[in-house]
Amino acid sequence: MTWKAGMKERVLRQHIEGCIDQVQEYVDLESAQAISSFESKAVDHFRCLDGLKAQYNTREDKISEFKRLQSEYATKVDGLEKSIEHFEKLSEEIEEFLVELEVKTKLASKRQS
């Protein structure tokens, strides 16, 4: 290899390295801008999502409240059913008592006659 050829090769390598450096700087700059843009959009989307969560979170609260009320009403219905059973038994006992009282009243009136 001659001196001129070696010199051209060295200049060519320097030129290629310069091009590589410029391409790397361009890639770094574009990457940084893309990352910054992505981060900014992600932050905006998370803010929007937080707003939507706050706006529609009541739905979960309402479901939870509905389940709680449903449980309370089921408990009250059970209590009412027990009360109804108790009063039905009491009614039967009162009817039996009235029948016995009627019989005793008839017997007492026959004795007096």
Curated annotation (Swiss-Prot):
<keyword id="KW-0813">Transport</keyword>
<feature type="coiled-coil region">
    <location>
        <begin position="75"/>
        <end position="108"/>
    </location>
</feature>
<dbReference type="InterPro" id="IPR020491">
    <property type="entry name" value="BLI1"/>
</dbReference>
<comment type="function">
    <text>Component of the biogenesis of lysosome-related organelles complex-1 (BLOC-1) involved in endosomal cargo sorting.</text>
</comment>
<keyword id="KW-0175">Coiled coil</keyword>
<protein>
    <recommendedName>
        <fullName>Biogenesis of lysosome-related organelles complex 1 subunit BLI1</fullName>
    </recommendedName>
</protein>
<keyword id="KW-0967">Endosome</keyword>
<comment type="similarity">
    <text>Belongs to the BLI1 family.</text>
</comment>
<dbReference type="GO" id="GO:0005768">
    <property type="term" value="C:endosome"/>
</dbReference>
<dbReference type="Pfam" id="PF17324">
    <property type="entry name" value="BLI1"/>
</dbReference>
<comment type="subunit">
    <text>Component of the biogenesis of lysosome-related organelles complex-1 (BLOC-1).</text>
</comment>
